[in-house]
């Protein structure tokens, strides 16, 4: 049987599926959107279907369903509203009432309101889409649907209940759109008029143009409806913004009337389901004639019908009984979880993944079914934003349908549908999730499915060449993909080291390479899951021919066995005398370890270093290059004004960069006369420096760095180069002036000899005269070595730092020795660090330097580091710097000077205390021998101011240093030889064991002088004692001590063997130390 008869039947086959999808998503604001004109809606032809009214808005005195929301005792029914029949073009009212099956179904009435006078037909899906995307997004954009279950038809209800306009506790009305259990429902949207009072509309009135389905709760208890999952249908104040979420309801669920027998907790029905044919396509249009003809015929055939009843057996039979037009205007009756295969046969469509979570849909006779009216609009103005989304949804649905149909998961899907129906049954009995009409876990599945299917890009087709070509490493065989196993990281790592031929043999390189596979757009999640692709490691180059000489041992693959190397290898590798070629591999490693040790040392004074770093950073920010101006345009510089002397002085300078800070007082307190250099010098001849003042109208004085006998050193900003420099201002004395000229000459030579700055010497910048003072500008460095030792608490430096600094100092001395330059003032104060956290150093202060053969001064070097030939008045050369180097290394190790003499007499006594007096040959060459020795060559006794008397050979070097490193002790002793000709040169020092890392197998005797020692070794195998400084000849005349007493002079003991022939033979436990001490002479006991 048909509810609405039509002149032409339109089937719901697959050919009209896309058309139904597009017609529901078309623009609803077109004037002829649905192809229905005003003249087609003839009241005479549609009078049998329903009643008409000229009022767009219903009577405000009629009670609404929202009244029941606010008060449990007040209800209303929209079925009993009487409409005047003067205006028939404004409303279309149809009553359709399908019958239920068995005892679980009852008579239901469908009341549909349509209007074309002031508004347009619209669907709940359109409302949902427009509400999401419209900028207005107000409460006026509502989909007004009233759905309910009422066993009493409209006219009978109007006749039997004359007071139906009053409140009733048995009639309820609900307005639900975009629900889950229903298909797309039609609603009336009035464009010309809006509710003046929305709260009043919700509480006391009913909106015009709604589908009203009512239910009498008292008469139909414990029965499920075809159109709702519960026994009650309530009015929702507005449509949900998104499926499953209720917003702006303006009522509380606790105020709804409860049915105790049903167990409905909240009273709000579940949200109906959006039909599957929504949001898939927007390109198809439905003919206008089908809709108009269907409406005309259906209205004529059902003219005198007030209620149409039919038993509803199955979902397929329901569609067969409906008229063709009802198949178009009413949505397909389907279950929320019907199978895809059976759904295709029954002309129903799969729900998109956005709404239905991509669950297979199966037809079930026992499940609840829903019916909603649908009218497919004309898509004259398609929404461009909705089109891509709809197409992608259709693609996902089709792919899901094909996948399910291919694998045939019918039994599994039916079991899922039964579980889902049971969950819906539970949700229909009440609870919070009963309002949303899905199970508690469906929202999570829905979100996961939406993120999985909606945002996934389209997978491009694989080129045929990859499938057909069998030479490639493709996992496709005969057009079918075979399961492959991804190689592990270890396998990939092993393949890196395979030869290139073996890797290339895996694939046929002769065959033509297939075309590249088009790549997909990679997302962030895909990148995180992709394994790292290792780069190709080049093959190991072959060994050079010189490595394949005699004695070379081939490399072994196993690390568990290391063959013993041949001794011929050391013989073939002869050490070179060049310092640059020695120890090239160990030096970078030692430098890094030394830098770590420097960080540990300076970490104790990190606060001061941070303050210094802030000051340095502020200076670096101020340092910049300034464009100079002429001396006549000095007023253009925003600096300090010129004094009267400067106004006359500035004429001697062509380029003016800086004249001083504006808040600096540049006036000198002394009288401006010629004796004091117009007040710019003090009585010592040093320049009176004012911080913030200029030097030569180019440098800005920042602070003081140091002051010495030659003058003073300032830290300045050079505005010509934009760098920080150290400016040395020499005293205004002729002696120092001449020496400063020599220094400037040597610095210029060093810049020529070392253009790449590789020999650890300060870099010269410029020199000039300013107010009768010679100024020398060099690069700015850090603190000196003495301050480093002081910051470490005079505890000495680590041996790795000492080795690193020693190597750099020897590198400097090597260049000076090759160029025959004597530094003449090598000390810790003249060795500066380049960085506080690094061991890189540079040698400064060449003010006392000279060339060999051009020695001017005899009193040179600092006392603690002064060589013996300088003290004794002998001729000196480059070996004096090697002596100073030995003293500096010893001080870096102990933290104190090795020879701390108060004057030259005590300084020489400190040297003889460890190494003894010098040889007579050296004393004869001394011009000052009478100061330190008597006529017989004996050292004159000397007592210091502290009452300390030092005796020769009273201490050993290892006692003073408290060191057991043989190479280190040997290195210092070779630097501290009496004879300069026997002293170690810088080239020899570069090849010493201490710097090259070769350790001597001979262990020194580190026991003190008065300590027990073991039995002496055999004389034949005893090592040769290290040579000592030559002793003066006058010591032969001294009387020897008694044999029973310890002797302090081993050489005298050996020379007096004629007088005491049995002395050495009677000693059983005796050994000669490094400095010639007899440890414990003991007479041999007689039997």
Curated annotation (Swiss-Prot):
Gene3D superfamilies reported for this sequence: DYRK, Phosphorylase Kinase, domain 1, Transferase(Phosphotransferase) domain 1
Ranges of biased composition (kind: Low complexity): 62-81, 292-307, 362-373, 429-442
Reactions catalysed: L-seryl-[protein] + ATP = O-phospho-L-seryl-[protein] + ADP + H(+); L-threonyl-[protein] + ATP = O-phospho-L-threonyl-[protein] + ADP + H(+); L-tyrosyl-[protein] + ATP = O-phospho-L-tyrosyl-[protein] + ADP + H(+)
Domain (Protein kinase): residue spans on this chain: 699-995
Source superkingdom: Eukaryota
CC terms in the record's Gene Ontology section: cell cortex of cell tip; cell division site; cell tip; cytoplasm; cytoplasmic side of plasma membrane, cell tip; cytoskeleton; lateral cell cortex; mitotic actomyosin contractile ring, intermediate layer
A Gene Ontology biological process term: mitotic G2 cell size control checkpoint signaling
Subcellular location: Cell tip; Cell membrane
Residues the record marks as active site: 825 (proton acceptor)
Cited InterPro entries: DYRK, Kinase-like_dom_sf, Prot_kinase_dom, Protein_kinase_ATP_BS, Ser/Thr_kinase_AS, Ser_Thr_dual-spec_kinase
Keywords, sorted A to Z: ATP-binding, Cell membrane, Kinase, Membrane, Nucleotide-binding, Phosphoprotein, Serine/threonine-protein kinase, Transferase
Function, in words: Polarity factor involved in localization of polarized growth and cytokinesis. Forms an intracellular gradient that serves to measure cell length and control mitotic entry. Controls the timing of mitotic commitment by regulating the inhibitory impact of cdr1/cdr2 on wee1 activity. Directly phosphorylates the tail of cdr2 which inhibits cdr2 activation by ssp1. Cdr2 phosphorylation by pom1 also modulates cdr2 association with membranes and inhibits cdr2 interaction with mid1, reducing its clustering ability, possibly via the down-regulation of cdr2 kinase activity.
Name of the protein described by the UniProt record: DYRK-family kinase pom1
């Amino acid at each position: 049987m048909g509810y609405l008869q039509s002149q032409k039947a339109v089937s719901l086959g697959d050919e009209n599926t896309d058309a139904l999808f597009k017609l529901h998503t078309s623009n609803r604001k077109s004037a002829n959107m649905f192809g229905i004109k005003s003249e087609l809606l003839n009241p005479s032809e549609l009078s049998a279907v329903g009643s008409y009214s000229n009022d767009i808005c219903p009577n405000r005195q009629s009670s609404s369903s929202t009244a029941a929301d606010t008060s449990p005792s007040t209800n209303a029914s929209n079925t009993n509203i009487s409409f005047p029949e003067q205006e028939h073009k404004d409303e279309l009212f149809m009553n359709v009432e399908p019958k239920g099956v068995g005892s679980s179904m009852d008579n239901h009435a469908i009341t549909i309101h349509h209007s074309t006078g002031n508004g347009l037909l619209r669907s709940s899906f359109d409302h949902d889409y427009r509400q999401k995307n419209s900028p207005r997004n107000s409460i006026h954009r509502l989909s007004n649907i009233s759905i309910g279950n009422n066993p009493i038809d409209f006219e009978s209800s109007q006749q039997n209940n004359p007071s139906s306009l009053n409140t009733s506790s048995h009639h309820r009305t609900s307005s639900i759109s975009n629900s889950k259990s229903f298909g797309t429902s039609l609603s009336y949207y009035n464009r010309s008029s809006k509710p003046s009072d929305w709260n009043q509309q919700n509480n006391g009135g009913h909106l015009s143009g709604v589908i009203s389905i009512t239910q009498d709760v008292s008469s139909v208890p414990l029965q499920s409806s075809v159109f709702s999952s519960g026994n009650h249908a309530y009015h929702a104040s507005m449509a949900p913004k998104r499926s499953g979420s209720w917003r702006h309801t303006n009522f509380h669920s606790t105020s709804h009337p409860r049915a105790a027998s049903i167990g409905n907790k909240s009273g709000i029905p579940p949200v109906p389901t959006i039909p599957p044919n929504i949001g898939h396509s927007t390109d198809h249009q439905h003919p206008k004639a089908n809709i108009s003809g269907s409406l005309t015929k259906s209205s004529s055939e059902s003219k005198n019908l007030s209620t149409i009843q039919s038993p509803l057996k199955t979902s397929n039979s329901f569609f067969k009984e409906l008229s063709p037009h009802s198949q178009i205007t009413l949505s397909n009756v389907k279950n929320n979880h019907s199978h895809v295969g059976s759904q295709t046969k029954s002309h129903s469509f799969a729900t998109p993944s956005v709404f239905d979570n991509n669950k297979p849909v199966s037809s079930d006779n026992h499940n609840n079914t829903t019916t909603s009216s649908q009218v497919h609009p004309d898509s004259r103005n398609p929404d461009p934003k909705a089109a891509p989304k709809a197409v992608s949804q259709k693609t996902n649905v089709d792919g899901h349908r094909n996948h399910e149909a291919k694998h045939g998961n019918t039994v599994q899907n039916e079991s899922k549908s039964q579980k889902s129906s049971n969950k819906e049954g539970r949700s229909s009995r009440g609870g919070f999730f009963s309002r949303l009409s899905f199970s508690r876990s469906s929202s999570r599945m829905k979100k996961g499915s939406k993120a999985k299917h909606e945002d996934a890009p389209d997978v491009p087709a694989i080129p045929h060449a990859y499938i057909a070509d069998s030479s490639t490493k493709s996992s496709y065989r005969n057009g079918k993909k075979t399961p492959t196993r991804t190689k592990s990281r270890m396998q990939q790592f092993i393949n890196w080291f395979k030869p290139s031929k073996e890797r290339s043999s895996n694939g046929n390189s002769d065959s033509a390479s297939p075309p590249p596979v088009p790549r997909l757009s990679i997302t962030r999640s895909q990148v995180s899951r992709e394994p790292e692709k290792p780069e190709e490691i080049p093959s190991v180059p072959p060994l050079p021919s010189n490595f394949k000489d005699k004695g070379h041992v081939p490399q072994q693959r196993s690390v568990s066995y290391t063959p013993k190397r041949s001794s011929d290898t050391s013989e073939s590798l002869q050490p070179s005398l060049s310092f640059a070629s020695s120890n090239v591999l160990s030096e970078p490693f030692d430098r890094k370890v030394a830098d770590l040790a420097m960080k540990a040392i300076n970490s104790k004074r990190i606060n001061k270093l941070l303050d210094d770093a802030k000051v340095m950073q502020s200076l670096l920010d101020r340092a910049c290059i300034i464009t100079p101006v002429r001396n006549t345009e000095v007023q253009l510089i925003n600096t300090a004004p010129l004094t009267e002397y400067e106004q006359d002085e500035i004429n001697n300078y062509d380029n003016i960069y800086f004249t001083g800070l504006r808040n600096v007082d540049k006036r000198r307190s002394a009288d401006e006369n010629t004796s004091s250099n117009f007040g710019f010098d003090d009585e010592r001849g040093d320049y009176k420096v004012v911080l913030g003042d200029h030097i030569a109208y180019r440098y800005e004085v920042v602070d003081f760095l140091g002051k010495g006998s030659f003058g003073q050193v300032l830290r300045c900003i050079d505005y010509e180069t934009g760098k920080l420099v150290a400016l040395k201002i020499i005293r205004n004395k002729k002696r120092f002036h001449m020496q400063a000229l020599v220094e400037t000459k040597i610095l210029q030579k060093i810049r020529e000899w070392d253009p790449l700055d590789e020999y650890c010497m300060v870099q010269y910048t410029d020199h000039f005269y300013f107010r009768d003072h010679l100024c020398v500008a060099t690069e700015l460095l850090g603190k000196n070595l003495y301050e480093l030792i002081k910051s470490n608490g005079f505890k000495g430096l680590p041996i790795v730092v000492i080795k690193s600094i020693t190597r750099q100092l020897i590198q400097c001395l090597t260049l000076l020795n090759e160029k025959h330059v004597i530094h003449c003032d090598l000390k810790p104060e003249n060795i500066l660090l380049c960085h506080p956290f690094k061991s890189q150093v540079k040698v400064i202060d060449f003010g006392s330097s000279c060339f060999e053969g051009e020695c001017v001064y005899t009193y040179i070097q600092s006392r603690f580091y002064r060589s013996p030939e300088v003290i004794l008045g002998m001729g000196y050369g480059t070996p004096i710097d090697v002596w100073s180097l030995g003293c500096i290394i010893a001080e870096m190790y102990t933290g104190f000077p090795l020879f701390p003499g108060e004057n030259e007499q005590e300084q020489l006594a400190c040297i003889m205390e460890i190494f003894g007096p010098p040889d007579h040959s050296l004393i004869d060459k001394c011009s000052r021998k009478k100061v330190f020795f008597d006529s017989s060559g004996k050292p004159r006794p000397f007592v210091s101011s502290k009452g300390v008397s030092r005796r020769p050979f009273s201490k050993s070097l290892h006692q003073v240093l408290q060191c057991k490193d043989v190479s280190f002790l040997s290195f210092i002793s070779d630097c501290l030889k009496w004879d300069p000709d026997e002293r170690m040169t810088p080239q020899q020092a570069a090849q010493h064991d201490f710097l090259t890392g070769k350790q001597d197998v001979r262990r020194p005797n580190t026991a003190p002088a008065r300590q027990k020692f073991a039995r002496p070794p055999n004389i034949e195998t005893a090592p040769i004692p290290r040579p000592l400084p030559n002793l003066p000849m006058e010591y032969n005349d001294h009387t020897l001590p008694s044999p029973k007493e310890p002797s302090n002079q081993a050489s005298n003991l050996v020379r007096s063997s004629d007088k005491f022939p049995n002395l050495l033979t009677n000693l059983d436990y005796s050994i000669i130390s490094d400095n010639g001490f007899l440890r414990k002479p003991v007479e041999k006991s007689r039997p």
